[in-house]
Amino acid sequence: AYQNGNKIGYSQTSAMLTGLKKSDDFAFLKAVDSIALQQSLRDLDRGFVNFFQKRAKHPQFKSKHSHHQSYRTINQSNNIRIVGKYIKLPKLGYVKVRQSMEVGKINNVTIEHTPTGKYFAVLNIEFEPQPMNNKGGKVGIDVGIKEFYSDSNGNVVYNPKYLEKSMRKLMREQRKLSRKEKGSKNRNKQRVKVALVHEKITNQRNDFLQNESTKLIRENQTICIEDLKVKNMMRNHKLAQHIGSASWSKFFDMLTYKSVWYGNDIVKVPTMYPSSQTCSCCGFKNPLVKNLAIRKWECPECHTKHDRDTNASINILDKGLQMQSA
């Protein structure tokens, strides 16, 4: 259609869906939540718009055989609500849930089926964040691989490296999976075991990131970070796995949305700013420190001894405060 100059958007696909529902071959569509079907068409339309505007890759076909499935539906006329230990969903009725927190007004819900066989209801809600009485501090953050981050106060948080610690077990379970016959029950059981290892790593990493980001938000009013282009850094194949495992982007995202909730200030220092090479005491720029192998150095100008990451975090704080006051 695109090559022939024809455009198919949400309106056209919605009309096609109506026709399919009337067909005997697709009668099962009537048993599905109609709002969820419309949402999938809107998502498809948005995906192609982003693709043609070069903001995203071509939308991928989602196979019904995939072990990760999800759908989203909108709350209309209170058709989605929490009642005691149950959640009411369109077409499904009341489903028992384990609720992790109190919820406000529900806008929409995404039902996810994970590769480990678990179901999650992810709620999009409206709530009024309560102001957080932080300590009013100001801090600069320099992220790394061995040390997850060093701050301008001299604190160092080490990278827990959950993926690396679980790699041996993950490889063992994956080898067992490769030996199972495709389509067999034993292969499916082993697939779940592999998925459980991945799920544990993800949960550990998310818990760590949530705790560290919340701690920084509680203790500081202003947080200065580098505006890292993580996607470009991932092109370094020697470091890509370690950078991905550290999840810097997700950490920065958490700091950003929590700062919006609680009124903190996040200042992003330009990537090209030489924070590691500049002496935080006298401002002398030492080009030799560009070598990542140098972890400690002495300033030739003022003879101050520096830890590479702590010095960088102090410079990031100073540059961020300078940008904030400009």
Where in this protein do the model-derived segments appear?
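Acidic carboxylate diad motif detector
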Residues: 14-114
